[in-house]
């Protein structure tokens, strides 16, 4: 493994089109902060970079719906999310914005360098143009009739009624959502990034990390690589975004695609931080020095943008250079999802707990601890109000808080607020805690991104401390053997100190309060010395005899009463009822039944069970898979708009339902001989209808 002298940590940029919720916190921002705080405690050089993703069509649509400017939208949510992060103790060194002038300059610099090298491909294509509005229309700005189900409210990217993924040109009677005029097809030039050019280099890069990257990261990435990497558009016709920095007429009215500009935010925000330090070139120390380790925290829905897209852009920049070479990520610890009361967080359906709202009711450290103990490292986990209440009351209040307060209050009342005894290493080791193993395991857990394990190890120290104090009974010993009671309290106070260090990355505000109650000025990070890991202080007692405590103690955690949780549970019950009713078809809004047909008409539809024998991606069509399906003794080719929901490997071997007598049609230059049936679940996720049973291939649906 490479030896690094410093660590650059980045976090996926939250989209400035809504507030962050607890799922975002659990998947990206809390684990990154825990890791960064641990590195700082070790006296290591570490930089924590984050910021807002502020471009793209959803933002312009929100602005138009509200009658405000895109700038107003991103200003609102950038401020809202930053305030929530700070209140939660997320310790960014810089939290930037992709709408900033410096970011625009950085992204344009990358574009121009790659354009100068001749890396981009230019491609003329036909897109809808609104002559009345004077602009080209992205897919979400076009509506019309779905060619599959006949819904008159289909959008240019998807029909919400039947779930079919579409292109604007497939709509019947298309209309502009801006002017309601019928758009016309016009030629427009766009720039494409040739991902396939870097496929071999990307494969080598990914394979070099097969022993240290998480399996989910490797699997997602290799699925894309196996399907072959296609050219990807990096420009689009839009008014809000980073302008294509070329003087030619074809570049007018075009901006950089948000996928290209957003991942460069990590670089521009580091440049911003450097300028704030008074050294404009300091950012190169973090991005272009091979002794710097780059660790990028993301959710699993962002994997390929950080394992393929950004590395490919940096590879293109580095091509042929002798200096100014960018580092690639050394690790991309993508988490799984944390669900909410058994269901996926969904902002569009308002099924979420938003971070800012949560922190108005409960302390940040109670949330940080609860999420750390449910960290979705290798599988989806679940946040529930009951679990949150139980962990706060049982583990934080009764175990940790109770021990700290008892130790400090008893020392203040019976020993004059001073550590009453010198603790020997033998006494420390006699507590029944293997300090060498504990310190090593704790360090390895934090370093290895195993944050649930780290929180558990630290809380186990608190449990052992409680058992020690309860069994020693210093309140009884003080009457007959004051010296024994003093030894007990000296050990207990040193345990308080150990806990303030072990738990600091997870619950920093609480540990700073413990630190101050122990008589220290400032917080735990005041103990940091360069290249001197504080965790090693766990190996022996740290508080000498006579060390003065604060005369005042605090209740670290108040218990959460049932009546505080009940409104939240009732709110969830209502949201679940609405979701279940929606799934069952009980909510009549949003449901449009098609016109009635006669039985004879229905009988004309030939639905049969088919088996997928082969599958591959369709070039230049990110939503389509080309499938070879067996129906009885015949084989057909079917194009299905499920590429964003199933990999080719996942489709092979499935039994599916095929509309077998649908007239063949050409899609993206390929013949499709039928249509497969799927249902749309929450968040637009498509699920194939998969018939069950033996020897059913070719059978008709009765």
Swiss-Prot record:
Enzyme class: ligase
Keywords attached to this entry: Aminoacyl-tRNA synthetase, ATP-binding, Cytoplasm, Ligase, Metal-binding, Nucleotide-binding, Protein biosynthesis, RNA-binding, tRNA-binding, Zinc
Annotated positions binding ATP: 347
Listed Gene3D superfamilies: HUPs (3.40.50.620), Isoleucyl-tRNA Synthetase, Domain 1 (1.10.730.10), Methionyl-tRNA synthetase, Zn-domain (2.20.28.20), Nucleic acid-binding proteins (2.40.50.140)
GO molecular function list: ATP binding; metal ion binding; methionine-tRNA ligase activity; tRNA binding
Annotated localization: Cytoplasm
UniProt cross-references to CDD domains, sorted A to Z: Anticodon_Ia_Met (cd07957), MetRS_core (cd00814), tRNA_bind_EcMetRS_like (cd02800)
Biological processes annotated in GO: methionyl-tRNA aminoacylation
Keyword Repressor included in the entry's annotation: no
InterPro entries, per database record: aa-tRNA-synth_I_CS, Anticodon_Met, Met-tRNA-synth_bsu_C, Met-tRNA_ligase_1, Met-tRNA_synth, Methionyl/Leucyl_tRNA_Synth, MetRS_core, MetRS_Zn
A single cellular component GO annotation: cytosol
Keyword Aminoacyl-tRNA synthetase appears in the UniProt entry: yes
Annotated EC: 6.1.1.10
Motif ('HIGH' region): 14-24
Cofactor remark: Binds 1 zinc ion per subunit.
Superkingdom as given in the UniProt entry: Bacteria
Catalysed reactions listed for this entry: tRNA(Met) + L-methionine + ATP = L-methionyl-tRNA(Met) + AMP + diphosphate
Cofactor: Zn(2+)
Function comment: Is required not only for elongation of protein synthesis but also for the initiation of all mRNA translation through initiator tRNA(fMet) aminoacylation.
Quaternary state and interactors: Homodimer.
Protein's name in the database: Methionine--tRNA ligase
Organism, as annotated: Chlorobium luteolum (strain DSM 273 / BCRC 81028 / 2530) (Pelodictyon luteolum)
């Amino acid at each position: 493994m490479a030896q690094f002298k410093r660590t650059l940590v980045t976090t996926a940029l939250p989209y400035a089109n809504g507030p962050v919720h607890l799922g975002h916190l659990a998947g990206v921002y809390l684990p990154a902060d825990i890791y960064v705080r641990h590195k700082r405690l070790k006296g290591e050089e570490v930089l924590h970079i984050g910021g807002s993703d502020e471009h793209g069509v959803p933002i312009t649509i929100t602005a138009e719906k509200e009658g405000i400017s895109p700038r107003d939208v991103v200003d609102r949510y950038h401020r809202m999310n930053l305030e929530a992060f700070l209140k939660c103790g997320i310790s960014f060194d810089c939290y930037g914005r992709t709408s900033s002038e410096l970011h625009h300059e950085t992204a344009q610099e990358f574009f121009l360098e790659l354009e100068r090298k001749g890396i981009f491909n230019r491609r003329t294509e036909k897109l809808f143009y609104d002559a009345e509005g004077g602009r080209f229309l992205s897919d979400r700005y076009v509506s019309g009739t779905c060619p599959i189900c006949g819904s008159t409210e289909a959008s240019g990217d998807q029909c919400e009624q039947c779930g079919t993924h579409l292109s604007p040109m497939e709509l019947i009677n298309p209309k502009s959502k801006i002017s309601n005029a019928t758009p016309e097809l016009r030629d427009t030039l766009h720039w494409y990034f040739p991902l396939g050019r870097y496929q071999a280099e990307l494969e080598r890069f990914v394979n070099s990390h097969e022993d240290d990257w998480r399996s989910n990261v490797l699997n997602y990435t290799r699925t894309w690589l196996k399907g072959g990497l296609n050219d990807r558009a990096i420009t689009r016709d839009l008014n809000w975004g980073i302008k294509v920095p070329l003087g030619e007429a074809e570049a007018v009215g075009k901006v950089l695609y948000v996928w290209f500009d957003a991942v460069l935010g990590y670089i521009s925000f580091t440049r911003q931080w450097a300028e704030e330090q008074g050294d404009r070139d300091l950012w190169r120390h973090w991005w272009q020095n091979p002794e710097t380790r780059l660790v990028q925290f993301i959710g699993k829905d962002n994997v390929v943008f950080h394992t393929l897209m950004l590395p490919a852009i940096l590879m293109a920049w580095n091509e042929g250079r002798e200096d100014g070479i960018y580092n690639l990520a050394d690790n991309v610890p993508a988490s799984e999802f944390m669900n909410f009361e058994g269901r996926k967080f969904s902002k569009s359906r308002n099924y979420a707990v938003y971070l800012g709202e949560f922190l108005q009711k409960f302390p940040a450290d109670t949330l940080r601890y609860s999420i750390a103990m449910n960290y979705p490292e290798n599988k989806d986990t679940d946040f529930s109000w009951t679990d949150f209440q139980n962990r706060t009351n049982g583990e934080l209040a009764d175990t940790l808080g109770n021990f700290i307060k008892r130790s400090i209050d008893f020392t203040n009342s019976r020993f004059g607020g001073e550590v009453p005894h010198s603790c020997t290493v033998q006494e420390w080791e006699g507590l029944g805690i293997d300090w060498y193993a504990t310190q090593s395991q704790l360090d390895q857990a934090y370093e290895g991104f195993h944050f649930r394990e780290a929180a558990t190890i630290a809380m186990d120290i608190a449990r052992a401390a409680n058992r020690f104090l309860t069994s020693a009974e210093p309140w009884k010993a003080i009457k007959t053997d004051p010296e024994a009671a003093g030894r007990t309290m000296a050990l207990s106070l040193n345990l308080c100190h150990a806990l303030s260090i072990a738990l600091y990355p997870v619950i920093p505000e609480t540990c700073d309060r413990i630190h101050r109650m122990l008589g220290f000025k400032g917080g735990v990070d005041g103990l940091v010395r360069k290249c001197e890991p504080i965790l090693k202080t766990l190996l022996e007692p740290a508080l000498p005899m006579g060390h003065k405590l604060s005369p005042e103690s605090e209740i670290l955690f108040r218990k959460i009463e049932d009546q505080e949780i009940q409104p939240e549970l009732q709110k969830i019950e209502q949201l679940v009822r609405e979701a279940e009713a929606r799934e069952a078809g009980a909510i009549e809004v949003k449901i449009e039944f098609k016109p009635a047909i006669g039985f004879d008409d229905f009988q004309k539809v030939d639905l049969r069970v088919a088996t997928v024998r082969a599958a591959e991606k369709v070039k230049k069509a990110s939503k389509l898979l080309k499938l070879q399906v067996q129906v009885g003794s015949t084989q057909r080719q079917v194009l299905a708009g499920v590429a964003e929901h199933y990999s080719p490997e996942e489709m092979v071997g499935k039994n599916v339902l095929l509309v077998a007598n649908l007239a063949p049609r050409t899609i993206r230059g390929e013949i499709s001989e039928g249509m497969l049936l799927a249902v749309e679940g929450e968040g637009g996720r498509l699920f194939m209808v998969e018939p069950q049973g033996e020897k059913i291939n070719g059978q008709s649906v009765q």
